[in-house]
Amino acid sequence: MAMVQPKSQKLRLFITHLGLLIFIAAIMFPLLMVIAISLREGNFATGSLIPDKISWEHWRLALGFSVEHADGRVTPPPFPVLLWLWNSVKIAGITAIGIVALSTTCAYAFARMRFPGKATLLKGMLIFQMFPAVLSLVALYALFDRLGQYIPFIGLNTHGGVIFAYLGGIALHVWTIKGYFETIDSSLEEAAALDGATPWQAFRLVLLPLSVPILAVVFILSFIAAITEVPVASLLLRDVDSYTLAVGMQQYLNPQNYLWGDFAAAAVLSAIPITLVFLLAQRWLVNGLTAGGVKG
């Protein structure tokens, strides 16, 4: 006999679906509007969602090509967007790899080893992570100004300095990976030790292969945080050619000349690396996000 849903349940289902559709529309509308602005003629922030006439001039400029207008004028690319994009990917990729390496080894020590002050160190790391980076900008500038005198490749106006600054944000990732490690039975490592494995071999050959989901999550979160970060990068980087895309895009919004179309094209380009990284690692993402929430 067919089951008949009561009217109240149908109403709840309808309201739920309607709410989800509104939520999806609220997320998609800004993205579609940015794409529409990048395809309009001129540099205007207002207009319809569907352009009257599609123009690729902003995309050509963003990709480094000059644009020739009907009256014979030639507009060269105002900024090196592709170079900024490469700088962003390079800094974010190296930062993410470094954070995964540091967080993993640190979390292993907190999850498997006993030493005095372990709980205090864990809490202290988390407390320091709660302070916004803006509060440390003056100290960071002074620190990297002095470091650059002795180690030039991590001084001011260097990508090494930006990466070195980003590597300090590992506290939350240490907690996340530590929680994941504690869900893995330590008897596996004990069995490896009985077979003659050293602690490093047990960590590398037993624990790490089982921890790929959480490592993928930490890599993605670190990559996104680094590629979209502005305050620290804008403080440490001075030359236009050394900018990341997040910092360089501010050049389009000069109070005397707002290049909204060019800005929109660069903004869409900036989302491509994040999307690719997410698509490549999505099969591990859900497992990793739901597995590290263990009380430690």
From Swiss-Prot:
Q: Where in the cell is it found?
A: Cell inner membrane
Q: Any idea which GO molecular function terms this record carries?
A: ABC-type maltose transporter activity
Keywords of the record, alphabetical order, are: Cell inner membrane, Cell membrane, Membrane, Sugar transport, Transmembrane, Transmembrane helix, Transport
Q: Which PROSITE patterns match?
A: ABC_TM1
The membrane-topology field of this record reads: Multi-pass membrane protein
UniProt xrefs under InterPro entries: BP-dep_ABC_trans_perm, MetI-like, MetI-like_sf
> Which residues face the membrane's Periplasmic side?
36-88, 144-152, 228-257
Name the SUPFAM superfamilies for this protein: MetI-like (SSF161098)
Which Gene3D superfamilies would you find in this protein's record? MetI-like (1.10.3720.10)
Grouped into one coarse class, the protein's main location is membrane
Q: GO terms for CC?
A: plasma membrane
Ranges per topology, Cytoplasmic: 1-12, 112-123, 176-204, 281-296
| TM region positions | 13-35, 89-111, 124-143, 153-175, 205-227, 258-280
Q: Where is the ABC transmembrane type-1 domain?
A: 85-281
Subunit structure of this chain's protein:
The complex is composed of two ATP-binding proteins (MalK), two transmembrane proteins (MalG and MalF) and a solute-binding protein (MalE).
Function (record text): Part of the ABC transporter complex MalEFGK involved in maltose/maltodextrin import. Probably responsible for the translocation of the substrate across the membrane.
Record-given protein name:
Maltose/maltodextrin transport system permease protein MalG
Q: Which organism is it from?
A: Salmonella typhi
